[in-house]
Amino acid sequence: MKLTCVVIVAMLLLTACQLITANDSRGTQKHRALRSDTKLSMSTRCKSTGASCRRTSYDCCTGSCRSGRCG
């Protein structure tokens, strides 16, 4: 009986901690696009600025292809 109560209290505390940290971190990521580009360049082989590209292939490290060149 005591063990069951301890487990229930522990689960309630862990759930409360997760909810508190989720509310605190809401809206704190300021540069989402920059972070996304950084992940893209680290996870795939990408083309550097000035290299030829196609808009449909998304292979530029910067994430943008303008007039056939990575920019």
Curated annotation (Swiss-Prot):
Coiled coil segments of this chain = none
Q: Where is the signal peptide?
A: 1-22
- Work out whether the entry's keyword set contains Hydrolase: no
Q: Give GO cellular component annotations, separated by semicolons.
A: extracellular region; host cell presynaptic membrane
Task: Give the matching SUPFAM superfamilies.
Answer: omega toxin-like
What positions belong to the pro-peptide in this record? 23-45
* Annotated compartments: Secreted
**Its domain of life?**
Eukaryota
Q: Which UniProt keywords apply?
A: Amidation, Calcium channel impairing toxin, Disulfide bond, Ion channel impairing toxin, Knottin, Neurotoxin, Presynaptic neurotoxin, Secreted, Signal, Toxin, Voltage-gated calcium channel impairing toxin
Residues bearing Cysteine amide are 70
Disulfide bond is among the record's keywords: yes
Query: Recorded GO terms, molecular function?
Result: calcium channel inhibitor activity; toxin activity; transmembrane transporter binding
Disulfide bridge partners, by residue number: 46-61, 53-65, 60-70
Do you know which InterPro entries this protein is assigned to?
Answer: Conotoxin (IPR004214), Conotoxin_omega-typ_CS (IPR012321)
Report the main location listed first in the record.
secreted
Q: What is the annotated tissue distribution of the protein whose record heads this document?
A: Expressed by the venom duct.
Q: What is known of its domains?
A: The presence of a 'disulfide through disulfide knot' structurally defines this protein as a knottin.
What family is it from?
A: Belongs to the conotoxin O1 superfamily.
Protein task: Omega-conotoxins act at presynaptic membranes, they bind and block voltage-gated calcium channels. This toxin blocks N-type calcium channels (Cav2.2/CACNA1B). Shows a weak voltage-dependent reversibility. It is noteworthy that ancillary subunits beta modulate recovery from this toxin block. Cav2.2/CACNA1B expressed with the ancillary subunit CACNB2a (isoform 2a) shows a low recovery from this toxin block, whereas Cav2.2/CACNA1B expressed with CACNB3 does not exhibit recovery at all.
The protein's name is: Omega-conotoxin CVIA
Organism, by scientific name, is Conus catus
